[in-house]
């Protein structure tokens, strides 16, 4: 593949990927009011909310909470509900009806849901991002949301069913987005709009519970079910909720995740050799996001890539920001690419020898007693695997599990220190022994030399997905990278990047057989003599 970050084997080992990165339905009746075009800052609105419910100190003192509710639909009792929250970012809701239960939960690692029918499923994409975002916000009553690398901006002032309200959008660079409504009159939170999960919620009848004001009426508009009214029966604080109640349900039988990961790792050399026989199209999208979560700039590059044995793939730029290269620039690009092929042909014996040396070195290390690749060995040493389970993903059976640092683990070096801060979830095809999807993020900030050399903020994240072709070969489909980094004394910045791969085409990867045609042709077969 063209770069280390595009290599399926490296993408499998989320620890190594992040080490590499270090180095290199809407709310009803929302009409806009005739209020002034300027609004209070998001921080001020949130501070006023915290004062209204009892103060920041009292809110932070609530380490966990359990509330019990009665569910009504059109004034008829339908069931009961339980909502559980635990700092720093865990949330579980359970609604029990006569015909079953609806359960959903989120932690910083993963989010999952179990409906009235079907098995539990691990959420992905915008659904998962929204669920994780809400868990972080609600578990701490919005206190110190910035420390979790969450952004906030005031969108507008609307006339809601509960009166004038400021609409504040909270977002993460990984795609989480929620809109909270705060009453202009009382400063209390009166609504949440979740477009990703097609849900809107209204909060009413605030009354004291312990040291805080809590809503005693909750109206939830779930897509396709109508409006459910929940009435608070009781709430308790700091009961010492176990973190395990937020974990996904595990499989009934024991699943050996360690053995499965070792098989996946050993399978990679053969898989990479097959992948290196394909050309493909790569689309890179880079976004500049400001401190309020607004995309200020987006650039898109589309290229064709041609793998070279034992060497980085040759990349041929096709377009930028949707515009094909001019004839003059295309000619220069073709000349540059042809020169790269010629150099690869000239160096192919040297490249082959280097590849053999690397292979021999790996064999030597394995003969000394370590049967694992270095990356997977560190990963297995540092991490434990939570709730291994069976799920359907991409219309195939998969084994899914969360991962986090082992309790009490003491890192011995910088790589282990970084891996120990990782959390996430992995989907594996148990038949083909391939990673189908991987999500990893930093639960804590990471610094080198006390932050003088490099500093990564919490929430730095990577997700990747592979897809299976009809001939059984697995290919990367996309990778998303989001992080805020500071490098030495040169400042830093935010990286928000998506790489998508498509149009895989098989051909012989012999350097001497390459001949590049015009940029308009996308058939690699036509580019050979």
Describe the function of each predicted region:
Residues 1-11:
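N-terminal secretory signal peptides that target proteins for export/translocation
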Residues 13-24:
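Bacterial N-terminal signal peptides
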Residues 24-32:
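Signal peptide processing junction and immediate N-terminal pro/mature segment
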Residues 31-164, 174-176, 240-241, 249-422, ...:
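Structured extracytoplasmic
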Residues 93, 192, 216-220, 438, ...:
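Beta-strand-dense domains in secreted/periplasmic systems and polymorphic toxin scaffolds
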Residues 104-107, 158-159, 180-185, 200-211, ...:
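Aromatic-rich beta-strand edge motifs centered on tyrosine
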Residues 117-120, 196-248:
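Extended, hydrophobic interaction surfaces within ordered domains
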Residues 154-194:
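A mid-sequence, solvent-exposed acidic-amphipathic segment
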